[in-house]
């Protein structure tokens, strides 16, 4: 369902201290945009309403996070959810940057100098038609871009409800010289300890759909 346009979204975002309106300006220098420049940097591609980032960021002040989505109408909800989580935990909100960016052009805002240590991809569009598969966030065309700014040994954490996307992504990762270090086709019964449930994950689980999850390490 298409989200209704919110004309107030961009003004609210631009008044936010952790919103970055022009991320291209920081390419190669992201560490210096954070208060603690020595923290590792993790990246979430497609942060949605920010449920995942709100929990991760507030639980791990020793990690800096970049959260990306394309629509202001979504980002403004992420902003509010992140602020709420930090306020409830009485944490300083100084380790998250929220920004608008088309993920297909992720290489216009990040490069090898940014040394991203982990990427999260949660419930991305499966693009099931053959002619659209190159749009997948796990497609080799994208993985090649991620490799440029992901450190050696860096990880991609990938969750999905879609069986076909998951199985084909396994081949994508192997093709692009990633090692699968963890895999489960039933995350909620796997015993995996630190799983933050997103809004999509909760919805799919209630429908009886098993959640697939893997960790891929850059070789």
From Swiss-Prot:
Entry EC no(s): 2.1.1.33
Catalytic reactions of this protein: guanosine(46) in tRNA + S-adenosyl-L-methionine = N(7)-methylguanosine(46) in tRNA + S-adenosyl-L-homocysteine
Entries under Gene3D superfamilies matching the protein: Vaccinia Virus protein VP39
Pathway: tRNA modification; N(7)-methylguanine-tRNA biosynthesis
Keyword Oxidoreductase carried by entry: no
Pfam families tied to this protein: Methyltransf_4 (PF02390)
InterPro entries: SAM-dependent_MTases_sf, tRNA_(Gua-N-7)_MeTrfase_Trmb, tRNA_methyltr_TrmB_bact
SUPFAM superfamilies given in the database record: S-adenosyl-L-methionine-dependent methyltransferases (SSF53335)
Disulfide feature: none
Domain of life: Bacteria
GO CC field: tRNA methyltransferase complex
Binding site for S-adenosyl-L-methionine: 44, 69, 102, 125
Binding residue positions for substrate: 129, 161
Function statement: Catalyzes the formation of N(7)-methylguanine at position 46 (m7G46) in tRNA.
Protein's name in the database: tRNA (guanine-N(7)-)-methyltransferase
Biological source species: Clostridium perfringens (strain SM101 / Type A)
């Amino acid at each position: 369902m298409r989200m209704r346009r919110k004309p107030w979204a961009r003004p609210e975002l631009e008044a936010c201290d952790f919103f970055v309106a022009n991320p291209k300006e920081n390419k190669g220098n992201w560490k210096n945009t954070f208060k603690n420049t020595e923290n590792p940097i993790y990246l979430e591609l497609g942060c949605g309403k920010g449920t995942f980032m709100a929990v991760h960021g507030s639980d791990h002040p020793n990690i800096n996070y970049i959260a990306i989505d394309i629509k202001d109408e979504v980002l403004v909800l992420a902003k509010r959810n992140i602020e709420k989580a930090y306020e409830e935990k009485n944490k300083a909100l100084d380790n998250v940057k929220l920004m608008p960016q088309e993920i297909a052009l992720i290489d216009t805002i990040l490069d090898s100098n940014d040394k991203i240590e982990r990427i999260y991809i949660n419930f991305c569009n499966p693009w099931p038609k053959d002619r659209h598969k190159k749009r997948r966030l796990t497609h080799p065309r994208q993985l090649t871009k991620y490799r440029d700014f992901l450190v050696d040994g860096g990880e991609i954490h990938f969750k999905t409800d879609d069986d076909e996307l998951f199985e084909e992504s396994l081949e994508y990762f192997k093709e692009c010289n990633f090692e699968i270090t963890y895999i489960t086709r039933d995350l909620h019964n796997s015993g995996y300890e630190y799983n933050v449930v997103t809004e999509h994950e909760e919805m799919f689980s209630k429908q009886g759909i098993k959640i697939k999850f893997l960790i891929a390490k850059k070789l």
